[in-house]
Amino acid sequence: MTTSTQAPSTKAQGEELREQVLAAARRAKQAAAELAVANRDTKDALLHDMADALVRRAPEIIAANDLDVAAGREAGLAEDMIDRLRLDDDRIAGMADGLRTVAGLPDPVGEVLRGQVLPNGLQLQQVRVPLGVVGIVYEGRPNVTVDAAGLTLKAGNAVLLRGSSSAERSNTVLVSILTDVVVEHGLPADSVQLLPCHDRASVRYLITARGLVDVVIPRGGAGLISAVVEQATVPAIETGVGNCHVYVDAKADVDTALRILLNSKARRVSVCNAAENLLVHQDIAAEFLPRALSELHSAGVTVHGDEQVVEAGGPNVVPATAEDWDTEYLSHDIAAAVVESLPAAVEHIRAHGSGHTEAIVTDDVRAARQFSAQVDAAAVMVNASTAFTDGGEFGMGAEIGISTQKLHARGPMGLPELTSTKWLAFGDGHVRGTGASGVNSCPAG
Protein backbone atom coordinates (compact mmCIF):
# COMPACT_ATOMS: atom_id res chain seq x y z
CA MET A 1 0.00 0.00 0.00
CA THR A 2 1.21 3.47 -0.78
CA THR A 3 1.06 4.63 2.83
CA SER A 4 3.70 2.15 3.96
CA THR A 5 7.44 2.12 4.26
CA GLN A 6 8.21 -1.44 5.33
CA ALA A 7 6.63 -4.59 6.70
CA PRO A 8 7.20 -5.84 10.27
CA SER A 9 10.65 -7.40 10.44
CA THR A 10 9.67 -10.32 12.67
CA LYS A 11 6.59 -12.34 13.48
CA ALA A 12 6.75 -11.13 17.08
CA GLN A 13 6.79 -7.51 15.96
CA GLY A 14 3.85 -8.23 13.68
CA GLU A 15 1.84 -9.71 16.54
CA GLU A 16 2.74 -6.77 18.75
CA LEU A 17 1.56 -4.33 16.08
CA ARG A 18 -1.64 -6.32 15.53
CA GLU A 19 -2.47 -6.21 19.22
CA GLN A 20 -1.66 -2.49 19.31
CA VAL A 21 -4.16 -1.81 16.52
CA LEU A 22 -6.84 -4.09 17.97
CA ALA A 23 -6.41 -2.59 21.43
CA ALA A 24 -6.93 0.86 19.93
CA ALA A 25 -10.05 -0.43 18.18
CA ARG A 26 -11.42 -1.85 21.44
CA ARG A 27 -10.85 1.47 23.18
CA ALA A 28 -12.50 3.27 20.28
CA LYS A 29 -15.53 1.01 20.56
CA GLN A 30 -15.91 1.94 24.23
CA ALA A 31 -15.51 5.62 23.39
CA ALA A 32 -18.10 5.33 20.62
CA ALA A 33 -20.72 4.19 23.12
CA GLU A 34 -20.31 7.45 25.04
CA LEU A 35 -20.13 9.63 21.95
CA ALA A 36 -23.35 8.13 20.62
CA VAL A 37 -25.35 9.73 23.44
CA ALA A 38 -23.49 13.07 23.59
CA ASN A 39 -25.88 15.94 22.98
CA ARG A 40 -25.53 18.53 20.25
CA ASP A 41 -24.49 21.36 22.57
CA THR A 42 -21.59 19.27 23.88
CA LYS A 43 -20.42 18.29 20.41
CA ASP A 44 -20.72 21.79 18.96
CA ALA A 45 -18.82 23.35 21.87
CA LEU A 46 -16.16 20.68 21.39
CA LEU A 47 -15.69 21.57 17.72
CA HIS A 48 -15.54 25.31 18.40
CA ASP A 49 -12.87 24.77 21.04
CA MET A 50 -10.94 22.46 18.72
CA ALA A 51 -10.95 25.20 16.09
CA ASP A 52 -9.67 27.77 18.58
CA ALA A 53 -6.96 25.38 19.77
CA LEU A 54 -5.70 24.81 16.23
CA VAL A 55 -5.32 28.54 15.63
CA ARG A 56 -3.79 29.14 19.05
CA ARG A 57 -1.26 26.34 18.61
CA ALA A 58 -0.54 27.01 14.93
CA PRO A 59 3.20 27.62 15.53
CA GLU A 60 3.47 24.15 17.06
CA ILE A 61 1.67 22.61 14.09
CA ILE A 62 3.77 24.48 11.52
CA ALA A 63 7.02 23.52 13.25
CA ALA A 64 6.10 19.83 13.02
CA ASN A 65 4.89 20.25 9.45
CA ASP A 66 8.13 21.96 8.41
CA LEU A 67 9.99 18.83 9.51
CA ASP A 68 7.63 16.64 7.46
CA VAL A 69 8.05 18.86 4.40
CA ALA A 70 11.84 18.85 4.73
CA ALA A 71 11.87 15.07 5.09
CA GLY A 72 9.55 14.76 2.09
CA ARG A 73 11.83 16.85 -0.08
CA GLU A 74 14.84 14.84 1.04
CA ALA A 75 12.96 11.65 0.14
CA GLY A 76 12.23 13.03 -3.33
CA LEU A 77 8.50 13.72 -3.01
CA ALA A 78 7.13 15.56 -6.03
CA GLU A 79 6.18 19.20 -5.52
CA ASP A 80 2.51 18.36 -6.02
CA MET A 81 2.73 15.94 -3.11
CA ILE A 82 4.64 18.50 -1.06
CA ASP A 83 1.78 20.91 -1.70
CA ARG A 84 -0.68 18.39 -0.27
CA LEU A 85 1.53 17.92 2.76
CA ARG A 86 2.23 21.57 3.53
CA LEU A 87 0.40 23.47 6.30
CA ASP A 88 0.61 27.20 6.92
CA ASP A 89 -1.39 29.77 8.85
CA ASP A 90 -3.97 30.11 6.09
CA ARG A 91 -4.53 26.37 5.78
CA ILE A 92 -4.75 25.94 9.54
CA ALA A 93 -7.28 28.77 9.66
CA GLY A 94 -9.19 26.98 6.91
CA MET A 95 -9.25 23.76 8.91
CA ALA A 96 -10.49 25.68 11.94
CA ASP A 97 -13.20 27.35 9.87
CA GLY A 98 -14.24 23.92 8.63
CA LEU A 99 -14.72 22.73 12.22
CA ARG A 100 -16.80 25.80 13.04
CA THR A 101 -18.94 25.23 9.98
CA VAL A 102 -19.53 21.60 10.97
CA ALA A 103 -20.49 22.79 14.46
CA GLY A 104 -23.15 24.99 12.90
CA LEU A 105 -24.70 22.17 10.89
CA PRO A 106 -27.72 20.23 12.15
CA ASP A 107 -26.90 17.18 14.26
CA PRO A 108 -27.92 14.14 12.20
CA VAL A 109 -28.14 11.85 15.23
CA GLY A 110 -31.74 11.25 16.21
CA GLU A 111 -33.19 12.72 13.02
CA VAL A 112 -36.48 10.98 12.20
CA LEU A 113 -36.37 9.90 8.56
CA ARG A 114 -39.85 8.43 8.43
CA GLY A 115 -42.53 7.16 10.74
CA GLN A 116 -46.00 5.75 10.83
CA VAL A 117 -48.64 4.30 13.10
CA LEU A 118 -49.59 0.77 12.06
CA PRO A 119 -53.24 -0.33 11.98
CA ASN A 120 -52.63 -2.17 15.26
CA GLY A 121 -51.51 1.05 16.94
CA LEU A 122 -47.77 0.26 16.98
CA GLN A 123 -45.78 3.45 16.37
CA LEU A 124 -42.72 3.10 14.11
CA GLN A 125 -39.86 5.52 13.52
CA GLN A 126 -36.66 5.21 11.50
CA VAL A 127 -33.98 7.44 13.03
CA ARG A 128 -30.35 8.23 12.31
CA VAL A 129 -27.74 6.74 14.64
CA PRO A 130 -23.91 6.89 14.60
CA LEU A 131 -21.98 4.29 12.65
CA GLY A 132 -19.78 3.57 15.69
CA VAL A 133 -16.05 3.23 15.01
CA VAL A 134 -14.83 4.72 11.73
CA GLY A 135 -11.38 3.89 10.36
CA ILE A 136 -9.77 6.38 7.97
CA VAL A 137 -6.74 5.35 5.87
CA TYR A 138 -5.19 8.30 4.05
CA GLU A 139 -2.01 9.60 2.50
CA GLY A 140 0.07 12.72 3.06
CA ARG A 141 -2.70 15.27 3.66
CA PRO A 142 -2.73 16.30 7.33
CA ASN A 143 -5.86 18.41 6.84
CA VAL A 144 -7.73 15.09 6.58
CA THR A 145 -6.83 14.45 10.22
CA VAL A 146 -8.86 17.46 11.34
CA ASP A 147 -11.69 17.07 8.82
CA ALA A 148 -12.16 13.41 9.73
CA ALA A 149 -12.08 14.04 13.46
CA GLY A 150 -14.56 16.91 13.29
CA LEU A 151 -17.09 15.13 11.13
CA THR A 152 -16.94 11.78 12.90
CA LEU A 153 -17.25 13.35 16.35
CA LYS A 154 -20.20 15.54 15.33
CA ALA A 155 -21.93 12.41 14.00
CA GLY A 156 -21.30 10.64 17.32
CA ASN A 157 -18.54 8.30 16.13
CA ALA A 158 -15.07 7.43 17.35
CA VAL A 159 -12.32 7.55 14.73
CA LEU A 160 -9.12 5.58 14.11
CA LEU A 161 -6.74 7.51 11.87
CA ARG A 162 -4.04 5.77 9.85
CA GLY A 163 -2.17 8.50 8.01
CA SER A 164 0.98 8.50 5.95
CA SER A 165 4.46 8.34 7.41
CA SER A 166 5.21 11.45 5.32
CA ALA A 167 2.86 13.44 7.59
CA GLU A 168 3.62 11.63 10.84
CA ARG A 169 4.88 14.64 12.81
CA SER A 170 2.03 16.87 11.65
CA ASN A 171 -0.62 14.26 12.39
CA THR A 172 0.82 13.50 15.82
CA VAL A 173 0.65 17.15 16.87
CA LEU A 174 -2.83 17.60 15.41
CA VAL A 175 -4.25 14.56 17.18
CA SER A 176 -2.60 15.63 20.43
CA ILE A 177 -4.27 19.05 20.19
CA LEU A 178 -7.66 17.57 19.34
CA THR A 179 -7.43 14.99 22.12
CA ASP A 180 -6.57 17.64 24.69
CA VAL A 181 -9.81 19.42 23.84
CA VAL A 182 -11.82 16.18 23.87
CA VAL A 183 -10.64 15.45 27.40
CA GLU A 184 -11.35 19.02 28.53
CA HIS A 185 -14.97 18.43 27.53
CA GLY A 186 -15.25 15.27 29.58
CA LEU A 187 -15.35 12.92 26.61
CA PRO A 188 -13.16 9.82 26.18
CA ALA A 189 -9.55 10.47 25.19
CA ASP A 190 -9.82 7.49 22.84
CA SER A 191 -12.45 9.23 20.71
CA VAL A 192 -9.68 10.22 18.26
CA GLN A 193 -6.67 7.91 17.90
CA LEU A 194 -3.70 7.89 15.53
CA LEU A 195 -2.46 4.44 14.51
CA PRO A 196 1.17 3.51 13.72
CA CYS A 197 2.08 4.53 10.17
CA HIS A 198 5.43 2.87 9.42
CA ASP A 199 4.19 -0.66 8.65
CA ARG A 200 1.69 -1.62 5.97
CA ALA A 201 0.45 -4.29 8.35
CA SER A 202 -1.24 -1.68 10.53
CA VAL A 203 -3.59 -0.96 7.62
CA ARG A 204 -4.32 -4.66 7.22
CA TYR A 205 -5.07 -5.09 10.92
CA LEU A 206 -7.38 -2.07 10.87
CA ILE A 207 -9.38 -3.06 7.80
CA THR A 208 -9.84 -6.64 9.02
CA ALA A 209 -10.90 -5.74 12.58
CA ARG A 210 -14.46 -6.90 11.95
CA GLY A 211 -16.61 -6.56 15.04
CA LEU A 212 -14.49 -3.71 16.38
CA VAL A 213 -14.39 -1.31 13.44
CA ASP A 214 -17.75 -0.58 11.79
CA VAL A 215 -16.58 0.99 8.54
CA VAL A 216 -13.29 1.93 6.90
CA ILE A 217 -12.85 4.79 4.44
CA PRO A 218 -9.69 5.07 2.29
CA ARG A 219 -8.62 8.48 1.00
CA GLY A 220 -5.74 8.62 -1.44
CA GLY A 221 -4.51 7.34 -4.76
CA ALA A 222 -5.83 4.45 -6.80
CA GLY A 223 -3.38 1.95 -5.30
CA LEU A 224 -4.37 2.72 -1.73
CA ILE A 225 -8.10 2.74 -2.44
CA SER A 226 -8.12 -0.53 -4.40
CA ALA A 227 -5.93 -2.28 -1.82
CA VAL A 228 -8.26 -1.30 1.04
CA VAL A 229 -11.45 -2.16 -0.84
CA GLU A 230 -10.10 -5.51 -2.03
CA GLN A 231 -8.57 -6.63 1.28
CA ALA A 232 -11.02 -5.25 3.85
CA THR A 233 -13.34 -7.56 5.76
CA VAL A 234 -14.71 -4.49 7.52
CA PRO A 235 -17.31 -2.71 5.33
CA ALA A 236 -15.45 -0.18 3.16
CA ILE A 237 -16.66 2.93 1.38
CA GLU A 238 -14.76 3.52 -1.84
CA THR A 239 -13.68 7.11 -2.20
CA GLY A 240 -12.93 7.40 -5.81
CA VAL A 241 -10.09 8.20 -8.06
CA GLY A 242 -10.88 11.47 -9.79
CA ASN A 243 -10.49 10.94 -13.53
CA CYS A 244 -12.74 13.94 -14.18
CA HIS A 245 -13.70 15.31 -17.60
CA VAL A 246 -14.62 18.73 -18.94
CA TYR A 247 -16.67 18.47 -22.14
CA VAL A 248 -16.89 21.62 -24.26
CA ASP A 249 -20.06 21.30 -26.32
CA ALA A 250 -20.64 22.69 -29.80
CA LYS A 251 -22.78 25.48 -28.37
CA ALA A 252 -20.48 26.47 -25.53
CA ASP A 253 -19.46 30.05 -24.87
CA VAL A 254 -15.72 29.96 -25.49
CA ASP A 255 -14.77 32.44 -22.77
CA THR A 256 -16.88 30.56 -20.22
CA ALA A 257 -15.39 27.25 -21.32
CA LEU A 258 -11.84 28.56 -20.96
CA ARG A 259 -12.55 29.90 -17.50
CA ILE A 260 -14.09 26.61 -16.36
CA LEU A 261 -11.31 24.52 -17.91
CA LEU A 262 -8.52 26.51 -16.27
CA ASN A 263 -10.23 26.46 -12.89
CA SER A 264 -10.98 22.74 -13.14
CA LYS A 265 -7.42 21.84 -14.12
CA ALA A 266 -5.00 24.43 -12.81
CA ARG A 267 -6.58 25.82 -9.62
CA ARG A 268 -5.03 22.95 -7.67
CA VAL A 269 -3.77 19.98 -9.65
CA SER A 270 -3.17 17.52 -6.82
CA VAL A 271 -6.79 17.09 -5.72
CA CYS A 272 -9.28 14.46 -6.83
CA ASN A 273 -11.75 16.98 -8.29
CA ALA A 274 -9.18 18.40 -10.72
CA ALA A 275 -9.97 17.82 -14.40
CA GLU A 276 -7.76 15.18 -16.01
CA ASN A 277 -9.48 14.99 -19.43
CA LEU A 278 -10.68 17.63 -21.88
CA LEU A 279 -13.19 16.69 -24.58
CA VAL A 280 -14.00 19.23 -27.31
CA HIS A 281 -16.84 18.99 -29.83
CA GLN A 282 -15.46 19.05 -33.36
CA ASP A 283 -17.70 21.97 -34.36
CA ILE A 284 -16.05 24.30 -31.85
CA ALA A 285 -12.53 22.84 -31.88
CA ALA A 286 -11.07 25.29 -34.40
CA GLU A 287 -12.17 28.25 -32.31
CA PHE A 288 -11.60 26.81 -28.86
CA LEU A 289 -8.48 24.65 -29.05
CA PRO A 290 -5.82 27.27 -29.95
CA ARG A 291 -6.87 29.48 -27.04
CA ALA A 292 -7.23 26.54 -24.66
CA LEU A 293 -3.80 25.14 -25.50
CA SER A 294 -2.23 28.57 -25.12
CA GLU A 295 -3.81 29.20 -21.72
CA LEU A 296 -2.97 25.71 -20.49
CA HIS A 297 0.62 26.34 -21.58
CA SER A 298 0.66 29.59 -19.60
CA ALA A 299 -0.56 27.63 -16.58
CA GLY A 300 2.28 25.13 -16.98
CA VAL A 301 0.02 22.28 -18.08
CA THR A 302 1.22 19.62 -20.53
CA VAL A 303 -1.51 18.42 -22.89
CA HIS A 304 -1.55 14.77 -23.95
CA GLY A 305 -3.61 15.07 -27.11
CA ASP A 306 -5.19 12.90 -29.75
CA GLU A 307 -4.29 13.43 -33.40
CA GLN A 308 -6.47 16.51 -33.88
CA VAL A 309 -5.21 18.16 -30.70
CA VAL A 310 -1.60 17.49 -31.70
CA GLU A 311 -2.31 19.01 -35.12
CA ALA A 312 -3.55 22.16 -33.37
CA GLY A 313 0.00 22.44 -32.09
CA GLY A 314 1.70 24.09 -29.18
CA PRO A 315 4.93 23.68 -27.20
CA ASN A 316 3.04 21.95 -24.40
CA VAL A 317 1.28 19.32 -26.57
CA VAL A 318 2.47 15.71 -26.78
CA PRO A 319 0.77 12.68 -28.37
CA ALA A 320 -1.52 10.80 -26.00
CA THR A 321 -1.06 7.12 -25.29
CA ALA A 322 -3.86 4.65 -24.54
CA GLU A 323 -3.02 4.91 -20.84
CA ASP A 324 -3.50 8.68 -20.74
CA TRP A 325 -7.29 8.46 -20.99
CA ASP A 326 -7.45 6.44 -17.77
CA THR A 327 -4.84 8.36 -15.80
CA GLU A 328 -5.50 10.47 -12.72
CA TYR A 329 -2.43 12.66 -13.14
CA LEU A 330 -2.67 14.79 -9.98
CA SER A 331 -0.10 16.95 -11.74
CA HIS A 332 0.19 19.64 -14.41
CA ASP A 333 -0.98 17.26 -17.13
CA ILE A 334 -4.27 16.78 -18.95
CA ALA A 335 -5.43 14.45 -21.72
CA ALA A 336 -7.41 16.07 -24.54
CA ALA A 337 -9.45 14.78 -27.46
CA VAL A 338 -11.80 16.10 -30.12
CA VAL A 339 -15.14 14.23 -30.30
CA GLU A 340 -17.67 14.26 -33.11
CA SER A 341 -20.78 14.59 -30.96
CA LEU A 342 -22.25 14.75 -27.47
CA PRO A 343 -23.03 10.99 -27.55
CA ALA A 344 -19.37 10.37 -28.41
CA ALA A 345 -18.33 12.44 -25.39
CA VAL A 346 -20.69 10.48 -23.17
CA GLU A 347 -19.34 7.20 -24.53
CA HIS A 348 -15.75 8.34 -23.90
CA ILE A 349 -16.64 9.20 -20.31
CA ARG A 350 -18.37 5.83 -19.85
CA ALA A 351 -15.24 4.08 -21.07
CA HIS A 352 -12.68 6.07 -19.11
CA GLY A 353 -14.36 8.03 -16.31
CA SER A 354 -14.05 7.04 -12.67
CA GLY A 355 -17.56 8.07 -11.64
CA HIS A 356 -16.34 11.08 -9.69
CA THR A 357 -17.21 14.40 -11.40
CA GLU A 358 -18.00 15.21 -15.03
CA ALA A 359 -18.67 18.68 -16.45
CA ILE A 360 -20.33 20.03 -19.58
CA VAL A 361 -20.01 23.59 -20.86
CA THR A 362 -22.91 24.49 -23.15
CA ASP A 363 -25.60 27.07 -23.85
CA ASP A 364 -27.86 24.31 -25.19
CA VAL A 365 -30.39 23.32 -22.52
CA ARG A 366 -31.21 20.04 -24.26
CA ALA A 367 -27.53 19.10 -24.46
CA ALA A 368 -27.12 19.87 -20.77
CA ARG A 369 -30.11 17.71 -19.88
CA GLN A 370 -28.91 14.86 -22.08
CA PHE A 371 -25.43 14.95 -20.59
CA SER A 372 -26.78 15.12 -17.04
CA ALA A 373 -29.09 12.17 -17.61
CA GLN A 374 -26.65 9.92 -19.46
CA VAL A 375 -23.39 10.47 -17.58
CA ASP A 376 -23.06 8.15 -14.59
CA ALA A 377 -21.07 10.02 -11.94
CA ALA A 378 -21.33 11.09 -8.33
CA ALA A 379 -21.53 14.72 -9.48
CA VAL A 380 -22.34 16.31 -12.83
CA MET A 381 -21.54 19.98 -13.36
CA VAL A 382 -23.38 22.08 -15.94
CA ASN A 383 -21.45 25.24 -16.79
CA ALA A 384 -19.46 24.95 -13.58
CA SER A 385 -15.98 23.81 -12.58
CA THR A 386 -15.28 20.27 -11.40
CA ALA A 387 -13.60 21.92 -8.41
CA PHE A 388 -17.01 22.42 -6.81
CA THR A 389 -17.28 18.73 -5.90
CA ASP A 390 -16.15 19.31 -2.35
CA GLY A 391 -17.81 19.02 1.03
CA GLY A 392 -17.04 22.60 1.93
CA GLU A 393 -18.42 23.93 -1.36
CA PHE A 394 -21.53 21.77 -0.93
CA GLY A 395 -22.20 23.35 2.46
CA MET A 396 -21.05 20.35 4.50
CA GLY A 397 -18.25 22.24 6.24
CA ALA A 398 -15.82 19.50 5.34
CA GLU A 399 -15.99 16.01 3.94
CA ILE A 400 -14.82 12.60 5.00
CA GLY A 401 -14.22 11.72 1.36
CA ILE A 402 -15.96 11.65 -2.01
CA SER A 403 -17.63 8.30 -2.57
CA THR A 404 -17.85 6.93 -6.10
CA GLN A 405 -19.77 3.82 -5.12
CA LYS A 406 -23.55 3.60 -5.14
CA LEU A 407 -24.38 1.91 -1.85
CA HIS A 408 -24.70 3.81 1.43
CA ALA A 409 -23.13 7.03 0.20
CA ARG A 410 -22.29 8.72 -3.10
CA GLY A 411 -20.49 12.00 -3.69
CA PRO A 412 -19.06 14.22 -0.94
CA MET A 413 -19.65 12.52 2.40
CA GLY A 414 -20.74 14.79 5.20
CA LEU A 415 -22.53 14.22 8.48
CA PRO A 416 -25.56 12.22 7.28
CA GLU A 417 -23.25 9.79 5.46
CA LEU A 418 -21.49 9.07 8.76
CA THR A 419 -24.66 7.66 10.25
CA SER A 420 -26.72 4.53 9.88
CA THR A 421 -30.36 4.06 10.84
CA LYS A 422 -32.29 2.33 13.57
CA TRP A 423 -35.96 1.38 13.73
CA LEU A 424 -37.81 2.29 16.92
CA ALA A 425 -41.17 0.71 17.74
CA PHE A 426 -43.38 2.11 20.52
CA GLY A 427 -46.12 -0.18 21.71
CA ASP A 428 -48.56 -0.60 24.56
CA GLY A 429 -48.14 -4.26 25.41
CA HIS A 430 -48.30 -5.22 21.73
CA VAL A 431 -47.66 -8.89 20.86
CA ARG A 432 -47.61 -10.37 17.41
CA GLY A 433 -50.45 -12.58 16.34
CA THR A 434 -50.80 -14.94 13.41
CA GLY A 435 -52.13 -14.52 9.92
CA ALA A 436 -55.49 -15.78 8.74
CA SER A 437 -53.99 -19.18 7.93
CA GLY A 438 -52.88 -19.67 11.50
CA VAL A 439 -49.18 -19.16 10.73
CA ASN A 440 -47.00 -16.08 10.89
CA SER A 441 -47.90 -13.74 8.05
CA CYS A 442 -44.22 -12.86 7.51
CA PRO A 443 -42.15 -15.82 6.23
CA ALA A 444 -39.09 -14.55 8.13
CA GLY A 445 -40.94 -14.24 11.42
From Swiss-Prot:
UniProt family annotation: Belongs to the gamma-glutamyl phosphate reductase family.
Gene expressing this chain: proA
Cellular location(s): Cytoplasm
Main subcellular location of this protein, as a coarse class: cytoplasm
Gene3D superfamilies: Aldehyde Dehydrogenase, Chain A, domain 1, Aldehyde Dehydrogenase, Chain A, domain 2
GO biological process: L-proline biosynthetic process
PANTHER family named in the record: DELTA-1-PYRROLINE-5-CARBOXYLATE SYNTHASE, GLUTAMATE SEMIALDEHYDE DEHYDROGENASE
Domain of life per record: Bacteria
Matching CDD domains: ALDH_F18-19_ProA-GPR
GO CC annotation, single: cytoplasm
Function: Catalyzes the NADPH-dependent reduction of L-glutamate 5-phosphate into L-glutamate 5-semialdehyde and phosphate. The product spontaneously undergoes cyclization to form 1-pyrroline-5-carboxylate.
Protein name: Gamma-glutamyl phosphate reductase
Organism: Saccharopolyspora erythraea (strain ATCC 11635 / DSM 40517 / JCM 4748 / NBRC 13426 / NCIMB 8594 / NRRL 2338)
HAMAP family according to UniProt: ProA (MF_00412)
Keywords: Amino-acid biosynthesis, Cytoplasm, NADP, Oxidoreductase, Proline biosynthesis
E.C. number(s) listed in UniProt: 1.2.1.41
Pfam families in alphabetical order: Aldedh
Catalytic activity as recorded in UniProt: L-glutamate 5-semialdehyde + phosphate + NADP(+) = L-glutamyl 5-phosphate + NADPH + H(+)
Pathway membership, UniProt: Amino-acid biosynthesis; L-proline biosynthesis; L-glutamate 5-semialdehyde from L-glutamate: step 2/2
Lineage, top ranks: Bacteria, Bacillati, Actinomycetota, Actinomycetes, Pseudonocardiales
Disulfide-bonded cysteines: none
Annotated GO MF terms: glutamate-5-semialdehyde dehydrogenase activity; NADP binding
